[in-house]
From Swiss-Prot:
Its main location: membrane. Residues 48-66, 121-143, 223-240, 295-312 are cytoplasmic. It is a multi-pass membrane protein. Disulfide bonds join 97-179. This is Olfactory receptor OR51C1. Keywords: Disulfide bond, G-protein coupled receptor, Membrane, Olfaction, Receptor, Sensory transduction, Transducer, Transmembrane, Transmembrane helix. Signal peptide: none annotated. One of its GO terms (molecular function) is olfactory receptor activity. Odorant receptor. SMART domains: 7TM_GPCR_Srsx. Belongs to the G-protein coupled receptor 1 family.
Length: 312
């Protein structure tokens, strides 16, 4: 297109998985199955932590926050993805695109915040167990949750809102199955350096800082565990952190890999970028319920109790 277009009049076209449009129906089958599994798993854990008195403890409150965040992320991606794959509904208005982008970014940042809170929870439990209940009171946990929401809103709203100031004069085709912030900026014919700077600042100030603090927490946890005299005590103490470490790795390793591929894998086919991005948004919501059900005895018992009660 040769002339500038105001953002409010734009209709973007989402391609889904570029180059593999003919296989969208087949691609949708595993994505749909895994997404529904993630929805059911997180719903079950959230229901268990709410209804089972034995799970009314700080660790499980944070786990319920993680499940709620994963539910939001799964719903945000599933609706648009299946609309493209099953019904070929590819057009999305600029405002809808911004809303979609905001919720995906928001729940991604919220997940990072909750993982940081869970790392802090384990640090307090391991390093200062006698004061654990005094430090992580119900009111303080609620404050942490509210602070995480406010931080996400304050950091992400400018990043998304600044897209409104841009003019768009190129093709309005987004080679993705959802509104990906860097791809939307590429369609602009105006200077996007401010947008890029704000976006990088927002993500580093949230996900980047969280990553550093989580790593510091686990370094301190490991140092505390190694200082325990008895090997049995070391094993028991460290086992309480295993599920958190796995969840942390499952969230951050794909995120870092996606960033590396996006920055340095420009020669890779477009469908590779899209499939990696879609998989990244799915893997944490899918795996977190599995990790905590397998590694946490109390969660496993609560889930089994709920399932048995429904059968009877």
């Amino acid at each position: 297109m040769g002339s500038n277009i105001t953002s409010t009049s734009i209709i973007f076209l989402l391609t889904g998985v570029p180059g593999l449009e003919a296989f969208h129906t087949w691609i949708s089958i595993p994505f749909c199955f895994l997404s529904v599994t993630a929805l059911l798993g997180n719903s079950l854990i959230l229901f268990a932590t709410i209804t089972q008195p034995s799970l009314h403890e700080p660790m499980y409150y944070f786990l319920s926050m993680l499940s709620a965040t994963d539910l939001g992320l799964s719903i945000s991606t599933l609706v648009t993805m299946l609309s493209i794959f099953w019904f070929n509904v590819r057009e999305i208005s600029f405002n809808a695109c911004l809303s979609h982008m905001f919720f995906i970014k928001f729940f991604t940042v919220m997940e990072s915040s909750v993982l940081l809170a869970m790392a802090f929870d384990r640090f307090v439990a391991v390093s200062n167990p006698l004061r654990y209940a005094m430090i992580l009171t119900d009111s303080r946990i609620a404050q942490i949750g509210v602070a995480s929401v406010i931080r996400g809103l304050l950091m992400l709203t400018p990043m998304v809102a600044l897209l409104i100031r841009l003019s768009y004069c190129h093709s309005q085709v987004l080679h993705h199955s959802y509104c990906y912030h860097p791809d939307v900026m590429k369609l602009s014919c105006t200077d996007t350096r401010i947008n890029s700077a704000v976006g990088l600042t927002a993500m580093f100030s949230t996900v980047g800082v969280d990553l550093l603090l989580i790593l510091l927490s686990y370094v301190l946890i490991i140092r505390t565990v190694l200082s325990v005299a008895s090997p049995e005590e070391r094993k028991e103490t460290f086992s309480t952190c295993v599920s958190h470490i796995v969840a942390f790795a499952i969230y951050y390793i794909p995120l870092i890999s996606l960033s590396i591929v996006h920055r340095f894998g420009k020669q890779a086919p477009a469908y590779v970028h899209t499939m990696i991005a879609n998989t990244y948004l799915l893997i944490s919501p899918l795996m977190n319920p599995v990790i905590y059900s397998v590694k946490t005895k109390q969660i496993r018992r609560a889930v089994i109790k709920i399932l048995h009660s429904k059968e009877t």
